[in-house]
């Protein structure tokens, strides 16, 4: 899994930071799969500075309906049609997302020439398919807001082909079924259990991408044990009370969550426009006082989950 940050500012853009949006490239072995998390104003323009194209998106997840996470969506959807893209697209987000998209398209006389599905989510499982389990967690914000936990399925262990051949199983298409741990029947009537020929499985990676939130119990549940946590860090620690009153988190509150949840890496993002580069580095230092393995997200930063 690989993250590309298209926008890392909160509320309004700055000269160096666009509105919130993140590409998740799943790098599937058999086909391309690309997801987008939030779509603030200017997101489609940010795409132009990356190797990616909106027409290749399969899914878009919206955390909440505040404009800095959403107002780039209608334009991106329309441009996708104008550029002749036909790949189906599914949108996920809180109640009201369907009305927002349909109203924006209707009032502007716009449409999509590709299949567009809009699914309004609630707390709990969003889907479990094609190697990934996505769960939505309710957060603490003035409007309905979710974070998304993306858990990669465990990868099957290596198939012991040499032992299969030694046991009289001929190489060929059956090996693909056995690799998946399935049972197959041979021409001589023997039934072979693939799971007996597999080495230890490799645990899948887990990614927690938060929407806007003040500290809350659900945040801990969502982040627990994640390999990577992407979390807003809107204000510095001295302004924690102000941040919380508006449904946001401070630098050290975010770091404390990462520490308590036992995450591998914290990527801090969604910085107030009041902070220049020096101010953001100051917040990074505050985070690292509590959770040393913290990274500061910047527009177009790429992070690959090893």
Curated annotation (Swiss-Prot):
Its cofactor is Zn(2+). The keyword Transit peptide does not apply. Keywords: Endonuclease, Exonuclease, Hydrolase, Metal-binding, Nuclease, tRNA processing, Zinc. NCBIfam families: PRK00055.1-1, PRK00055.1-3, RNase_Z. Zinc phosphodiesterase, which has both exoribonuclease and endoribonuclease activities. Homodimer. This is Ribonuclease BN. It comes from Klebsiella pneumoniae subsp. pneumoniae (strain ATCC 700721 / MGH 78578).
